[in-house]
Every structure is written in structure tokens, then in C-alpha cells.
Amino acid sequence: MSQLLPSLVELDQHAQAEPEFATWRVGFGPFEHALETQAAVFRLAHQLVQAGHQPDLASVYRLLQAVDRVASAGLWLVVHMTYARQVHLDGSPLAAEDFKQHPEGHTGGALNMVPAYAGYLALNALTGRTRAWLMGQGHCVAAVDALNLLTGNLHPEQAQAYAGGEAGMNRLLQDFYGYGQAADGSPLAPLGSHVNPHTAGGIAEGGYLGFAELQYAHMPLPGETLVAFLSDGAAEEQRGSDWIPRWWRAEDCGVALPVMIANGRRIEQRTALGTEQGLEDFRQHLSQCGFDPMPFDGRDPAAFVTTLWEMELRLERRVEEKARGILNYPLPMPYGIAETVKGFGFYGAGSNAAHNLPLPGNPSRDEQSRDLFNEHAARLFVAQQELAASLELFTRSRQGRTLERDNPLASRRPPAPTMPKLNYRDDACSPMAAVDRFFVELTAANPALRPRVGNPDELASNRLGGVLKALKHRVIEPESELEAVDGAIITALNEEAVVSACLANQGGLNLVASYEAFCVKMLGVVRQSIIFSRQQKEIGRPAGWLGWPLIATSHTWENGKNQQSHQDTTFCEALLGEMNDMVRVLFPADHNSALALLPSIYQARGELACLVMPKRDRPCYFDQAQAEQLARDGAIVVEEQPGNEALLLIANGSYQLGEMLRAAKRLKEADCAYRLVYLQEPGRFRGPRDHWEVVARASEGVAERLFPDAMEMRVLLTHMRPEVARGHLWPILPDARKCSALGYRNRGGTLDEFGMQFANRASWANVLAACARLRNVPRTALLTRDEAAAVAGKGDPQILRGDA
């Protein structure tokens, strides 16, 4: 650290004057306190007393002694969670029968997280203020679970299962990778291999390395502080994590404190950061990106305390200097680098084996491994009386402040937004115009809800010009009236980064729009978020953040000016495979049907919506009443010609509705009975997979009314791949012999809308060919000879372009 620190002589003199400092500086168990850390603790103690956070220096040093002991006990418990079936609280060696037959755990990373999380807890205790935490390497959750158990920071279900001394600890050990299941197949234990909703204070799974790096700066609101523990492996993997200084603004962001656990190893090999040169290169890279790198001893809980405290002070000073005109954005963002070795504190530290199972064998069967476990665990053991005294200091510090379990980011529930007036139209226009006006008016009506727009590219091209004009790109140096330092639009040619800004903004209003084909790059981070939200719901603590739409536009059927890379329906198909009560997959056909959906999307809690919609002008298919009914029911009858053996035509997608209407016109001319239904929300008509999806289905009787059993011959024309749609929609496509499904067949190229439809056998003429097959009549009963030849691939496709 660059500040002036006391010399060794001064520290020795201070130790003579303050016995508690002398006791602490000796270290405990695996923890040794480097001179630089001792000096930082000296300064920290004086600052805390001067600020009124602590009554005297001795109180600070006693709590730091306590955190050494709590952290050592945390290391001890983590290695027991991996290997042991039960603990010996008297510290006696474990026998063969005390070990698991099949040990499992991400032991090395969890051991590295123990001093980190212990330091976070200690800073909260010392300052009387609860910060939030985030862990990008969610597989290290054993550290958090162990320390939460020791300090009593538990949700009720974990307290019931694991509190109460030795018996509770033994249950924790046995549940950890115990694979127990409830009768319905769900995990039985309130525990997991990654951060989950049972983890006190947990806000993200951390299953994909790198996503926390993209999200942490967008999470806290002003007045809040978030400590983000990050992975050195993710720094190699995730582009965009080094852009945070671009986006952070004191005016609308809370304090974000990133700390990388630089243990230098992936699962199988050393990372670049595992070398001195690699660390130095990384520090230089961070500096060039606008960070203020702060390397420190990642093996010492006290070093985490002092570094986090110093990071807060530095950022506070820089915000003050910005207010005085001394600095401009981007402010140098403090970035802690905790230098350590993988698996510090136990056998095998620094080896590849440290990642998972550091011992050479299974201690339940191998005597050498058993001896090594007992030898190294003994070095971590803290006598119960000594540990209890240390924990008492943590407990006492919680008086008058929020438990870490209940930190603001883990308890998000912004007020319900005021909805703007809905302005329906009766002219042909872009469906995106509905979103454009609605979101501008929504954000204006709710100034207390921080807006974020995720924009990979071409917001104006995607017909969100009003949003762009009102909210502006967030930049450092504006070069047009569409850019501003305080802009709310996060623009980067990186889909994961921009959607992460919105997924992280759980206290505000969000919108993401992208080319449909490129939305696929968002899938992993979106899926991780909705899975976490679903799990919160399942355990009875549903997420409170406001829903918002992911808009897939410039989509497959209207992106013919580009090549087939831009023609991909995978995103909506994949999200349709997720639980329908967590992400609605919607296909508004026109302006009004899009507009009618938006209030329910933004009033939802803990749910997303995927809107697959055109950006080009489309006819007005539905008036206000029809659009609102469609939003309620998920599907609607568009038109009908009664008669015997009526065909049931099902359109899913705006361009598909246009083609179906052309086909219906020809059926009417042929005096053929039919019903045309527009299917806007396919997930409402799927076979539910659990009781939550039952609730998300269409209302009682809607499916039977729209898709009556008497209409056995059915043709679906879908935006998606037909095989995917048919699989999800088997309840309304029950008999494969009497149902035909048409859609995207992975054909494309530089083609216009008609060319895309013809190439994929998804035009109006292909619909009529399917109708003829189902009715067992020749195609020429519904098509001219030339049209039939074109459908068969033996004629001129251009003949199908004209009006039917």
C-alpha cells in the first residue's frame, strides 16, 4: 500500500503499550501476520476508534484475534466437510469409520475463501455496518457455509438442520455432497455444491466463472456496499470484467469492492496469475483499464479486513475529489488482489490435487491419508472454549445492525412501479414502437427505480430510438446528444456483459434488446439467474426484483440481408425449455399485442420474459380488446369458417400469422372449414412439469375452447424449429398422424422474408400443402398446378410471391 505506515520499531513500541496488539501479531494456527499487515492493522485500529466505530484500540485487536480463531475453525470445518462423516470437538484424531466412503468437495478454493469471508464478517463487526457479498466461484460455498454455521448467520432451515453443536455439524458433513433426495426428487438437504438460496446472504450461484465479474458493479444502489470475491481463472476467461470503471458512477451506484482470490491455479494447471510476471502484468492491465490494484496477503484474514477498509476509504476520497472537480470519470476503482496458494492451510496446498481432494488417497481406507488428515487438521483445531469466546465477540457486534443473511442485496423488493397509459394504435407500424414508448414513459413515471438498458449494438436500428434519446449511452466522453456520462444504456459488443448489467440491477427497471441470433450468447447467464430465482421460490423466499423483457428482434425471418449466422431460433427454443413460471416466451405479432404484454411483465417479481418480435412494420392484427385478451389467455381465435372436418390452423409468430392468413383466404375460397388461432405464449399450453407450471398454464377451459378435440386435423406454423415446438406443444398437437408442424428448418442465407419462408417450407403455400395432406386431397385442390410444382421444388418459387 502506498500510504505511510508505521515502522517495525513503532510497531514494537505499540505492542508494548497495547498487549492485545502484541497477542494478535504473534498469529494463530496457520495465520502469520506480515509486517505490512501489522502496519495496516495499526492504522485501521486508530481510524476505527477516531471514527467512533470502536471504543478503544484493544477492542479492535481482540476482534482480530477472534477472527483468526474463527477462520482457523472454518478451515478445520471445510476439510471435515470434504472428508469426514463426523467431527471430534475435543480435537482427537478421526478413525477410519469417521471418514466418508466417497469424499467430495472443491476443497482448495473453499480453503482460500475462508480467510476472505472471515475478513468480510470481521469488517462488518468492526464497523457496525453490514455489507453484501457476492462470490463468483460459487463452488467454494463450503467456506461460507462453514463460517455461517460457526457465527450463527443462518436461514431458519439451516439453523434447524445444522445448529446445536456436534450433532448439527455432523449433519452438515453428511449432507455435504450427500446426494439426499426428497420424495419428489428435489434435494433433501438445505445445502448445495454452489451458492444457493439456502446460503445465508447468497445472491448468485456463481456456477459460471466470470459472470459475477460482469455484474458486481451494477448490483449495489447508492448507500449500499458490496464485496465481490472473484476468481483469477475468470479473469482469463471473461471479456468485459475489466470494463467496470466505464460503467460505475457514484450518483447511481453503490460501493463495489472487487477482490480477486489469486491462488494461481485452474483445476488442472497453473494460471498466468500463478507467476510473479503474470501478477505484475495483470496489475498493469488493471491500471490501464481504470482500476487501482491493491495486492495483499490473501492468506491472512486481517489483511482482508484492512484492504477492504482501505478500498472503501480510497473510493470515498475519489468521489469527493470528483465532486470538487479534481477528478473525472472513470475514477480509479480499488481492486484487491489476494495473493495466496490453492488450498492454503491444509496438506497439498499449491498442487493440482488441492482443487478437489488434496490427500493422496481416501482416508477411510488409506492409513497414510488418514494420518495426513489428522496431522494437518490438528494444526487448524480451535478448542471449544476459546472458539466460543471468539464467537461471542461476533455475536455482540450484531446488536443494532442487520445480519449478513439479510443484507439489502439479498432482500431486494423494490416498490411496484407506476404503469404508464397504454397507447394502442390501428395503423401498420413496428411492434418495437410499443416497447420504445412504454419504457420511456415507465422510467419517467418511476424516477426512484434505476433504469438500465442492455444494448449489444444498434439500438436505433432495432427501433428503440426514443429509449436512446431519453436514456442515452453511458460513456466517459460524450460525442453526441445520444451519449451522456450518466446515461442508463450499457452498450458493448458483448451480449453477456450488457445482459449482466440488467440481471444485476435488481433494484430497478430493465430492458435488453438484441438480434435474435446473438441472444444465444446470453443464454448461460440468463439461465443461471432464473434457476436461482426458481430455487428461491421453491423454498418459500421468492425473489422480489421486478420482471423485465429480453427482446429478440431483427429476427430469423426478417434478417435475410445477412447470412445464416444471423438466422437462429435457438434462444427462444432454449428458454421455452426452462420453467415457464420463471421465463415467459412470447411472440407478439403486432404493436398492440406487444403493448398489452408489457404491464404484466414489469409487474411480475423474479421472472423474465423473452419477447420474439419483428422490428419491421407489421399490420395491425389485433385491436385493444383482442390484444388484452391475447395477453391474458396466451392465444386467441383470429378468424373462423365453420363447417365439417374443420382444419385447425395455429400461427406462432408475426410473419407466420401473415402466411396463415393468406392460406386461410385460399381455404375460404375453396369452401374448406377452418379455424385460425394465434399462439402468442406457447408455454401456457405445454404439459406442466410441476405444480408451479400448473399455475402458469392458461386458465381453466381456455385450451379446450381454443383447441377443441373435435378439430383433429391441425397445422402449426411456428417461428421456431417445428420439432422443438411440436415437442413442447404435444397437448395441442396430440396425434402426429393428424398434425403437421412447419417452421425453421435451418435453411437460410441472403434472402428476403419470402425467400426465408420458402427455403424453410414455411410459406402460405406449404401450409396449404399440409392441409391437403391432412384432408387426403391432392395439393391442386388448394393450389394451382404451378403453385403445387413450386411447393414440390419443381417450379418457379417466385410464383408464390403474389397475393393468394
PLM-predicted stretches and their roles:
Residues 368-428, 766, 771-777, 786-794:
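N-terminal leader/propeptide and maturation segments of large enzyme subunits in energy/redox metabolism
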Residues 98-114, 133-140, 186-205, 231-235, ...:
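Active-site nucleophile and cofactor-binding loops and adjacent substrate-binding regions
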Residues 213-227, 506-523, 677-680, 778-779:
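Glycine-rich phosphate/pyrophosphate-binding loops
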Residues 63, 67-93, 101-251, 465-467, ...:
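Cofactor-binding active-site loop characterized by glycine-rich and histidine/acidic residues
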Residues 65-69, 75, 82-88, 133, ...:
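Non-catalytic terminal/interface segments that mediate subunit docking, oligomerization
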